[in-house]
Regions:
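Active-site entrance/lid segments in N-terminal catalytic domains of soluble metabolic enzymes
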Residues: 1-217
Length: 217
């Protein structure tokens, strides 16, 4: 992909969303029976190479169980609504309605953002983390719990105590080395991975080089 000049000494490459990408067959095709899609993380085997994103609009305990039945996995976020509310069904329905109202012009974006902040201001409950892990495990699926880098240290003890199978460190943009002015202590991924027995996945990197850097930790 050609690089584009974006400033003095700086360049970048055009990024594409999934909606803009089409997969076309090559000149040589292969019978489906001869294709192997299974993969493995530590001792955990999956039939399809898919882990559903740890977003409240994507992954729930029920989604994780169903994904496990289909051969994949789904990461439930320890800071999501499922670990803040006993039953977030009504809250999720309200969020969907807020989106509908904004699209139709019935409410503004400012009001929607403010209500979302109120909804997510509910405190994460450690007992709910343990219950979601147990719920997914009882459903027969591999338990995958996600947490943001900023909250990893504060929630780690509760997550480890719940005994998930996989831990995902998930951020909008995640790197192996974070520079700060010292006001906030950054998460040391290398140290974290080495002191945990649970396999750790890190998500939120947008390039091949960033992925390699993370894997070297």
């Amino acid at each position: 992909v050609a690089e584009i000049e974006i400033g003095i000494g700086k360049s970048g490459r055009r990024g594409y969303s999934l909606d803009e990408v089409a997969i076309s067959p090559s000149r040589r095709t292969r019978d489906a029976d001869e294709v192997e899609t299974s993969w493995q993380i530590d001792a955990y085997q999956f039939e399809i190479p898919v882990i559903a994103a740890p977003l409240d609009g994507v992954s729930s305990p029920a989604t994780a169980i169903e994904m496990g039945r289909l051969g994949g996995a789904a990461a439930v976020h320890a800071e999501g609504l499922w670990c803040r509310y006993e039953d977030p069904t009504d809250v999720l329905a309200e969020i969907a309605e807020l989106t509908t109202q904004r699209v139709s012009g019935q409410s503004g974006e400012t009001e929607q953002i403010e209500r979302m902040r109120q909804i997510y201001s509910a405190v994460v409950q450690p007992d709910l983390i343990a219950r979601r892990v147990a719920q997914i495990r009882d459903g027969g699926a591999t338990v995958c719990i996600a947490v943001t880098p900023a909250s990893t240290e504060s929630l780690l003890a509760h997550i480890v105590r719940a005994e998930p199978d996989l831990l995902v460190i998930h951020g909008t943009v995640t790197s192996a080395e974070h520079l700060t002015d010292g006001a906030h202590e950054p998460l040391d991924l290398k140290h974290l991975v080495r002191r945990l027995e649970v396999p750790v996945l890190v998500g939120g990197c947008a390039s091949y080089q960033a992925a390699l850097h993370l894997m070297r930790t």
